[in-house]
Amino acid sequence: MTSKFTDLAIDCADPSGLARFWCSVLGYEVQDEDGGVVTIGSPMVPEGKNHPGPVPPTLTFAHVPEGKTVKNRLHLDVNPTDREQDEEVRRLLGLGARHADVGQTGDVSWVVLADPEGNEFCVLAARRP
């Protein structure tokens, strides 16, 4: 027996705002919003598939009073699906991301960005559909 990765919970100051940002990044949509907690996921699986409903993993944003103070110990890597890395970085910066320095050197193939609340993530060079 094993476990499946189904959801990533993210503490934040503005669950709705951060959920909107990540929906734009990933092409996700809001699945549930209740009492300061917002869950987003991929669009529903079309009818006739084996498991109708959101395709995991989902992201759940929960309001917490304290802010982020240190570098993430866990982060997301995203892959552009229909454009080159530099084009995707420009798109994400336009959505509200910013460049982040986590000690990376100039000779790495990924770009480190932070979401509007400072959570670091990487944009990889490889395109994956």
Model-predicted regions and their roles:
Residues M1-A19, L74, R127-P129:
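N-terminal beta-strand motif that seeds the catalytic metal site of vicinal oxygen chelate
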Residues D11-P56, G94, D107:
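Core segments of cupin and vicinal oxygen chelate
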Residues A13-P15, L76-E117:
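Vicinal oxygen chelate
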Residues W22, E117-F121:
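Short, glycine-anchored, charge-dense loop/turn motifs used at functional sites
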Residues G41-V45, L113-P116, A126:
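Active-site beta-strand termini and strand-to-loop segments that position acidic
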Residues P57-A62, V112, F121-C122:
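Conserved beta-strand in the GNAT
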Residues D107, C122, A126-P129:
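Short, charged, intrinsically disordered terminal tails
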